[in-house]
């Protein structure tokens, strides 16, 4: 049986739709009264694990799942070994650098040296500023990073931005985009090397249906 790690939250519905087109129906996961964290497909050929987006690479890397769907932003933060197979072209949002509207910063190089930048994505933020040769202190937050500039703790934030509504409502605006993040299909490297026909068939089906 194929095991698939599916991300709970914003990516779940489209993830289930992708696998349904490939012949694996996990629609029970979308039922309002569902509390189960494991869902067997109607055809009994696969089961899904419903996990947090950030945990998908963990389950896939350690072999508890053969396949998974996860945001590119998570893959950029993770150092776990997974096979990156396909850009599924949904769940799009930008990883962005943002500052207060009242600041005088219009580009990254305007930020003062050694200023504080708040982010959930510390590895991504550090790599970005290192590439620009801009010395900053990265402050790791797990909640609403917008509060960093609002409270004066940080001059800027690095965070995911979909519509920009949250930034606008909190008096912030983007001054740069680091990258565009979409959902990605990943696999356990050993599962791929074993070259299971059912697994390969699912991957090929998804490749043919993605973006439709």
Swiss-Prot record:
It comes from the Bacteria. Pathway: Amino-acid biosynthesis; L-histidine biosynthesis; L-histidine from 5-phospho-alpha-D-ribose 1-diphosphate: step 1/9. One of its GO terms (molecular function) is ATP binding. GO terms for cellular component: cytoplasm. It holds the Pfam family HisG. Its main location: cytoplasm. It catalyses: 1-(5-phospho-beta-D-ribosyl)-ATP + diphosphate = 5-phospho-alpha-D-ribose 1-diphosphate + ATP. Coiled coil: none annotated. It is an enzyme of class 2 (transferase). InterPro entries: ATP_PRibTrfase_cat, ATP_PRibTrfase_CS, ATP_PRibTrfase_HisG, ATP_PRibTrfase_HisG_short. Signal peptide: none annotated. Its EC number is 2.4.2.17. GO terms for biological process: L-histidine biosynthetic process. It is found in: Cytoplasm. Keywords: Amino-acid biosynthesis, ATP-binding, Cytoplasm, Glycosyltransferase, Histidine biosynthesis, Nucleotide-binding, Transferase. SUPFAM superfamilies: Periplasmic binding protein-like II. Catalyzes the condensation of ATP and 5-phosphoribose 1-diphosphate to form N'-(5'-phosphoribosyl)-ATP (PR-ATP). Has a crucial role in the pathway because the rate of histidine biosynthesis seems to be controlled primarily by regulation of HisG enzymatic activity. Lacks the C-terminal regulatory region which is replaced by HisZ. Belongs to the ATP phosphoribosyltransferase family. Short subfamily. Heteromultimer composed of HisG and HisZ subunits. This is ATP phosphoribosyltransferase. The gene is hisG.
């Amino acid at each position: 049986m194929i095991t698939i790690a599916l991300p709970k939250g914003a990516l779940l519905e489209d993830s289930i739709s992708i696998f349904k087109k490939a012949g694996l129906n996990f629609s029970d996961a979308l039922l309002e009264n569902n509390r189960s964290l494991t869902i067997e497909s109607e055809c009994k050929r696969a089961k899904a694990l419903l996990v947090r987006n950030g945990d998908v690479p963990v389950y896939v890397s350690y072999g508890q799942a053969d396949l998974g769907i996860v945001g590119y932003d998570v893959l950029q933060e993770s150092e776990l070994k997974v096979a990156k197979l396909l850009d599924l072209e949904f769940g799009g949002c930008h990883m962005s650098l943002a500052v207060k509207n009242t600041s005088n910063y219009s580009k990254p190089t305007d930020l003062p040296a050694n200023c504080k930048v708040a982010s959930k994505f510390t590895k991504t933020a550090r790599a970005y500023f290192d590439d620009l040769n801009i010395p900053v202190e990265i402050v790791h937050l797990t909640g609403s990073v917008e509060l960093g500039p609002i409270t004066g703790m940080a001059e800027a934030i690095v965070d995911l931005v979909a519509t920009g509504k949250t930034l606008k409502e909190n008096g912030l605006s983007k001054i740069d985009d680091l990258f565009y993040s979409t959902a990605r299909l990943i696999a356990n490297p050993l599962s791929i090397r074993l070259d299971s026909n059912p697994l390969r068939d699912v991957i090929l089906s998804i490749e043919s249906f993605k973006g439709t």
